[in-house]
A protein has these predicted regions:
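A structural signal for short loop-to-beta-strand junctions that line the ligand-binding cleft
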Residues: 73, 81-82, 113-154, 185, ...
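Extracytoplasmic/periplasmic substrate-recognition and gating elements
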Residues: 77, 133, 157, 230, ...
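Extracytoplasmic/periplasmic solute-binding protein
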Residues: 129-140, 145, 155, 169-221, ...
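Short, solvent-exposed loop/beta-turn-alpha elements that line the ligand-binding surface or hinge
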Residues: 105-120, 164, 206-231, 278-279, ...
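Long, aromatic- and glycine/proline-rich binding clefts that accommodate carbohydrate-like moieties
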Residues: 119-120, 341-400, 404, 432-438
């Protein structure tokens, strides 16, 4: 009996000492701060709680630019994350980095996880799909440009809070009334190149670059110095001189000035909705991107923004299985609908859009379907999207040149001509470096 007792004690001790089956860790680098950072952390927590085999570890790596730079360095050093969030302007660069990535379609197939590219919203999935039809990255947080406005400020200025300006001339008139009522920042904009050049072009069915805006080849060249583009930037420059448009900086710097109530109107990401809902102390509204009513074919559709998730090469098979399971979890209609409603990002799948509509969310939150309506319209060769090499550098050039207009140092034509010339130098450089692919 004593021997049996000793044997049992030894067995129990061994069981306690033996490590539990270790979870497979999946590193996810992202660029989401604030409320969106909390959302990302919640997504990982929910997935981790739903099963015990894998553990997704999200890590904030700074801005999209900083995260991409860090990931390139990490890949070269052999310690890249499994998943990297890359903004849409980095798509062509990632596509050219064949050895550094594994197409998401391939990851899902090898893991034996059901994956139907047709289940995703076409305008979103299409942007991240190769010419051969293979989806290259997971369309995680896709947004588009919309018009946000402060309904309380509209009331104070004698404007109808339920009738936002739909055209650029109407924006100028509303801005003048807001200024007259004492508002020091009637209108601003975030992501200037995206909102005022890229989306502006698609919305007016006007070419931004040749080769279908780069979607049909890396030998594309910029064309956004057309008379329509010059007219628009000239109008914004004149609004800046009159104090009707106040430039608040690059990237999403203007977002905070709208949420705080400092600026009354802004063009920016549909994903600003989550921040507004959480932090704004005023009633806000969402409307479509303004357009020029005399331009034939306008409004057309807006282009995609936000980012997708790329799977990095050089990982183990069981780790890729974890990545596939995580993507499958994010694609569940109820999960994707929850994310869309919380953030203002576009619904990931058709099913999540239908679920959101059926729940009455759009009726209860007027304007939240604007981004979807702008994106589901049939696209043209000029409006399908923009996919250019060295796009990050091109956007920086556009920021620099447009800042010269806002400061009154260059005319709109000078600035756009210079932006196109400098941007085309970047495209030529990218083409030379990647001449093996079309």
């Amino acid at each position: 009996m004593k021997l049996k007792s000793l044997a049992l004690s030894a067995a129990l001790a061994a069981a306690v000492a033996a490590p539990a089956h270790a979870q497979v860790e999946i590193q996810w680098w992202h660029s989401m701060g604030g409320a969106l950072g909390e959302w990302v952390n919640d997504l990982a927590k929910d997935f981790n709680a739903s099963q015990s085999t894998y553990r997704v570890v999200p890590t904030f790596k700074g801005s999209y630019d900083e995260s991409m730079t860090a990931a390139i360095a990490a890949f070269r050093a052999g310690n890249a994350p499994h998943i990297l969030q890359v903004f849409e302007v980095g798509t062509a660069t990632m596509m050219a980095s064949r050895n550094a990535i594994v197409p998401v379609g391939e990851v899902m197939k090898k893991a034996g996880v059901t994956f139907d590219p047709n289940a995703y919203v076409p305008a979103v999935a299409g942007y991240y799909t190769a010419p051969n039809g293979q989806m290259l990255s997971f369309p995680f947080n896709s947004s588009t440009t919309v018009f946000h406005y402060n309904k309380d400020a509209f009331r104070a200025a004698g404007l109808d809070p339920n009738s936002p300006p739909k055209t650029w001339p109407e924006v100028a008139l509303a801005a003048a009334k807001l200024k007259a009522s004492g508002h020091k920042c009637p209108f601003t904009t975030s992501w200037v190149s995206w909102t005022q050049l890229e989306s502006f072009s698609a919305w007016h069915n006007t070419e931004f670059a040749t080769k279908g805006n780069g979607m049909r080849g890396i030998d594309a060249r910029l064309t956004f110095n057309s008379p329509l583009h010059v007219r628009h930037i000239e109008n914004l420059g004149n609004m800046a001189k009159q104090g009707l448009f106040v430039y608040k900086g690059r990237g999403n710097a203007a977002d905070a000035t709208f949420v705080s109530g400092e600026c009354a109107m802004t063009t920016g990401s549909s994903a600003l909705y989550g921040n507004i809902k959480r932090n704004a102390k005023f009633e806000s509204g969402i409307s479509t991107l303004p357009y020029y009513p005399d331009v034939p074919g306008a409004p057309q559709n807006t282009v995609i923004g936000g980012a997708s998730l790329w799977v990095m090469a050089g990982k183990k098979d069981n780790e890729y299985k974890g990545v596939a399971q995580f993507f499958a979890h994010l694609s569940k209609p109820e999960e994707a609908a929850k994310s869309h409603q919380r953030t203002g990002y576009l619904p990931l799948t058709k099913a999540s859009y239908e679920l959101t509509e059926k729940s009455g969310f759009y009726k209860q939150n007027p304007g939240t379907d604007v981004s979807v309506e702008q994106m589901i319209r049939k696209t043209t060769d000029k409006s399908r999207g923009i996919r250019l090499g060295n796009f990050v550098q091109i956007r920086t050039i556009n920021d620099e040149e447009l800042e010269q207009v806002w400061a009154g140092r260059k005319t709109a034509k000078q600035a756009l001509d210079d932006a196109v010339r400098r941007g085309n130098e970047q495209l030529e450089r990218f083409q030379r470096a990647n001449s093996g692919r079309s």
